[in-house]
Amino acid sequence: FLFQPFTIPSASMEPNLYEGDYIVVSKFAYGWSSASLPFNPPIVKGRLLKRTPARGDVVVFRLPRDPSAAWIKRVIGLPGDTVQIRGGQVLVNDQPVARTPLGAARDHDAPERRVLAVRETLGDGRSYLTYDGGFGQPGDDTGPYRVPAGQYFVMGDNRDNSLDSRWPGAVGVGLLPEENIIGRAEI
């Protein structure tokens, strides 16, 4: 009940995690919910021994529309935050997340596709790599999302190849309820 192995199901977290990679999920990092238990039994409402994910954490969670599916994304917006994407630039509470272009890269999932490798650095100094497919990609421009209490805004690091909180729950993740979080990815 403390740790769980997890296989990366898609290319949405490239260039940091690749489809088929194995990681360990710390199920106690944020406390427990029914999502932390095998088969997702609806026996617990909310989280026990609740701790809050930090912006930049990579979390594994049960997809709200299909609790049998486990997905992985990076936490971008916390409860109370406003998140918006303008021209591919992530803004949290109207502050742009710092971006440093690193040069062209080949998309591992589609080797014929060239992307821009970018280092994003959060306000607290945490940084990570992302892929940017260029201007005009779906999801590059959004309205503001106000993250309500008990929910999170999550994104894949392969920004133009990720169904995440930029997309409504019927297609992507929508805003992620905290009780759907299984745990933190320990990479």
Where are the predicted features?
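Aromatic-capped interface at the extracytoplasmic side
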Residues: 1-13
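Soluble "head" domains of membrane/secretory-pathway proteins
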Residues: 4, 15-187
